[in-house]
Amino acid sequence: MKFIIESSSVPIYNRIATAFAKTLMEFGHIVHFIDASGFNDTDFVNTINGIEIDYYISTNELNVVQKKSEFDDSFLFEKLQAKIIFIHHDNLFSAFHSISYIANKLQALTNISQRSYHFCLEESNIDLLKAAGITNAVKINHASEFTAAPIVTQSQWGVTFIGHLMSSLNLYPADSVPGGNHLQVMAWNRFSQSSYAVQPDIENLVQDPHVLASLGPDADKNQLATQQFLVAGLNKFSSPMRGQLISTIKNHRVDIFGGDLSYGRIDNPLLVLQQSNVHYQPATQNYQDACGIYQSSRINLNISSLQFDTAVNNRIFDVVLSGGFVLTDRRKDLFDICSFADAISFETPEEMNEKIAYYSDTANNVRYFDLKMAIHEEFKSSFTYINAIDHILKCIAPLDDANHLR
């Protein structure tokens, strides 16, 4: 078959798109890997429609194919003739902060539902799409191209975190986010109980006419869109919630790689966690550097973003398949895919601290190394891009057949 895959200027998205392209070619398919950023709308549509392909693959919501047209109310994917595969590595609308925009895009996705396929990390996204009449929606997990084996030697680093965070939920300006005071409470609930599901509370919130009125005139026109608008707002609290959790670690050194969203340019107590046991290191420059830190850390912390209730994010797969040890907030999907999920998960800040103390103690090395090896063995054959592509192709084949019969 013939595919177009769109590249991305965002490193994590481009890494995923590149891995999909490489793996499809290994399967023997023809892949056009394109940078669409230089096209205007007309040239983009005409160029893509002029190429004979079976599927256009979009791996993130910022791809050009998912832009709204400059000339009318349609989205560019509506103007393409090819079938489209959307791979949603984030919550469906987490990048957008306009109810009307989300509603329009959801309708546009409904318009092409007979020739499109959605693969979602988050289970609630599948429910959302089906509620909108989009039936070709399937669960998918992340994959990783890392293949480093665990090392059974003393770690270079102790407790580490790679990624962005802020210092505190208390310092974050909740009033700057529509519905922000409600959303901040949800962030605190997730801080207190990592398996707390935000989606039911979001759904309840949009039943309140007073809340809807406070969100503006578009809020009561499409409740599905309003829910996603609130989830996008809630996700802004992810970085401060991570810092809030890490601030509870008092008895172990924590090294944060990156972390500061301003990269040191802004002096603001919200941006940097001021704590004697917390040390900031330069941001990693590439994913091989990250892989090395994952492998050489005693404990890699993972704290999922608030846009997800159940999904396992890519950091967990990357840590394990870099030969590292991960300690993560409790994720329902992790219990579905990992036999040892309970051993590497925490529900509360107190449990996180207890497990940091336990796995940091060299007296527990046998248990620590056994877990690291066993989880790596479980993941290495299951969460590859070969398996991800195989899953996608097997899912779209019967859906294609069913659509031909309609």
Regions found by a protein language model. Give the residues of each.
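Histidine-centered beta-alpha loop that forms part of the nucleotide-sugar donor binding/catalytic region
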Residues: 60-61, 88-92, 121-123, 141-144, ...
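Catalytic binding pocket for nucleotide-activated donors in carbohydrate/polymer assembly enzymes
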Residues: 3-9, 15-27, 32-39, 111-112, ...
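Short N-terminal targeting/anchoring amphipathic segment
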Residues: 48-65
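An aromatic- and histidine-rich active-site surface loop
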Residues: 61-78
